[in-house]
Amino acid sequence: YNLHDKLYLDPRLGMKYHYSDNVALKLNAGLYHQFLTTANNQDENLRLVELWLGIPEDKPASLAQHIITGVEYMSPGNIFYRLEVYHKDFDNLLTLKQDNPNTVEGDDPDSTVLNDFWDTDGNSWGIEFLLKKSSGRFNGWVGYTYAETEYYTEPSGWHHPNFDRTHTLNVVGNFDLTPDLEISTAVTKSSGNPYT
């Protein structure tokens, strides 16, 4: 892939400070460029195949700026807890223009259904909690995420993209029946998409 003849720097920073034997504070930040975009109709709620395209050469690469901070705690009972808060800014995203089945007379002759995009910016923020037990006959983890994502396009203004799910709960459990036999289960529960 070489549509872009430009060098992009993606610096990243990760720090962890051990406040005590059981408590650690974390900070992560970074820049992330992406050279792919989806070319799917945003009005489709059920999609079996995601169509990905390279960013057109006349568009800059998508940029995400991440910052994540959190605290970790290992209890005397060997149960791990983690709480994180994050914020992400998105620039130069692309959203496929809808209702453009083909070029029409008078339009740009190079415009097709798969290269006509709205310039899109966005942001995302959320809180994540993890509880994890790694030892003993019964072990597993519970994770909960509260997240919000918003995109801005010229025709729609600020809106929630169709993949935005506010609440997600994951539960994984393992039980050792014998030293050689383990049973496991996993359950995921999430709120629905913003549009139905």
Describe the residue ranges of each PLM region.
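Membrane-spanning beta-strand positions in outer-membrane beta-barrel proteins
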Residues: G14, H18, A24-N28, I68, ...
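Gram-negative outer-membrane beta-barrel transporters
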Residues: H87-D89, D110-Y195
